[in-house]
């Protein structure tokens, strides 16, 4: 068995989307703090991986390409090659048959930790049951770190998922925004009006009304940010709203990593819940997100505060004196529509008023 200060190798496996990966970052940092001379490798899908390159909590990003995702033979070969490096710890946050393959090829690894699932996980030597937790971050730390405490290590937990851009990258984006006409003397809002996942999109008509409200009340600079595949849809929405010098849809963020310097140049994030909201929290700007019916606010909004706000359809049950039985019979669209525009305006006001730029 290795000691706390030994040079050890750690592999953390976390597939899925941007939000899932971001909320796994505290686990990676906790491992580095607990084992100060460790090297932490982080396995991610290729569309998410660039965000974590050169991150101080991660030593090496291992990318699973789209071809490897789709082709089982290429995937198995990739996992086999990755595990030729001797790992002292493997933590499989995903704990699916696909991700467990990393442990199948690493039978001599001292700690092979996965989440407890019935009739699965035969190649983990620690199958951890879920514990009571505050949110996703808390859940991963409470569920996956206890084996080290039981082994006598002094476990250090960290709950932050910070992101930073270099001063050059930040300045580059500021220049880009200035050239587009953004007035930094006014509140600059990164506005998430669209999502590649259709059920996450709060009704566009109401969003348009919110945009107009924020401009009328605060003279806000509204920036519709998007990935390359969303450009046409975003510019269509902008055209429908009409020509307005306070709305910008030409400031592109070509890669996921570009979102970091872009958000660092904004004062607020407002709009649909998603990975970008987690990133806004990670760079430290005030954020207010509208959660769709399938996203549990308690899980996906770590450490809510005046600076990190959210609203979900469940929150409207009490406000509208709605019987739970009736709510449960509603379609997702009907549940989503329970979040009225007045509530969203009020919460947007609260975010802006309580987090004014100093």
Predicted segments, located by residue:
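Catalytic machinery of carbohydrate-active enzymes
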Residues: 1-358
């Amino acid at each position: 068995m290795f000691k706390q200060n030994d040079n050890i190798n750690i592999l953390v496996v976390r597939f899925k989307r941007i939000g899932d990966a971001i909320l796994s970052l505290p686990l990676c940092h906790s491992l580095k703090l607990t084992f100060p001379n460790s090297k932490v490798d982080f396995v991610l899908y290729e569309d998410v991986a660039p965000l974590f390159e050169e991150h101080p909590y991660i030593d090496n990003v291992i990318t699973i390409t789209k071809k490897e995702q789709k082709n089982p033979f290429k995937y198995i070969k990739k996992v086999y090659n990755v595990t030729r490096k001797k790992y002292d710890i493997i933590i499989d946050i995903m704990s699916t048959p696909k991700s467990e393959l990393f442990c199948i090829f690493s039978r001599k690894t001292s700690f092979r930790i996965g989440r407890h699932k019935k009739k699965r996980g035969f190649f983990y030597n620690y199958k951890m049951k879920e514990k009571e937790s505050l949110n996703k971050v808390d859940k991963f730390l409470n569920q996956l770190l206890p084996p080290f405490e039981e082994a006598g290590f002094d476990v250090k937990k960290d709950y932050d998922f910070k992101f930073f851009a270099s001063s050059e990258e930040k300045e580059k984006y500021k220049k880009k925004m200035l050239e587009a006409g953004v007035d930094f003397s006014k509140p600059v809002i990164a506005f998430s009006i669209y999502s590649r996942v259709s059920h996450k999109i709060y009704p566009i008509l109401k969003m348009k009304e919110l945009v107009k409200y924020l401009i009328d009340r605060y003279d806000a600079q509204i920036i519709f940010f998007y990935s390359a595949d969303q450009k046409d849809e975003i510019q269509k929405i902008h055209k429908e709203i009409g020509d307005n010098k306070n709305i910008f849809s030409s400031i592109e963020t070509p890669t996921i990593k570009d979102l970091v310097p872009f958000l660092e140049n904004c004062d607020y994030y407002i709009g649909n819940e998603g990975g970008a909201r987690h990133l806004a929290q990670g760079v430290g700007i005030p954020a207010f997100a509208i959660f769709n019916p399938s996203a549990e606010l308690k899980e996906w909004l770590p450490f809510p505060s005046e600076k990190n706000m959210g609203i979900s359809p469940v929150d409207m049950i009490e406000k509208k004196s709605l019987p739970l039985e009736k709510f449960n019979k509603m379609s997702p669209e009907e549940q989503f529509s329970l979040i009225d525009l007045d509530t969203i305006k009020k919460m947007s006001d609260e975010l802006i008023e309580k987090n004014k730029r100093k």
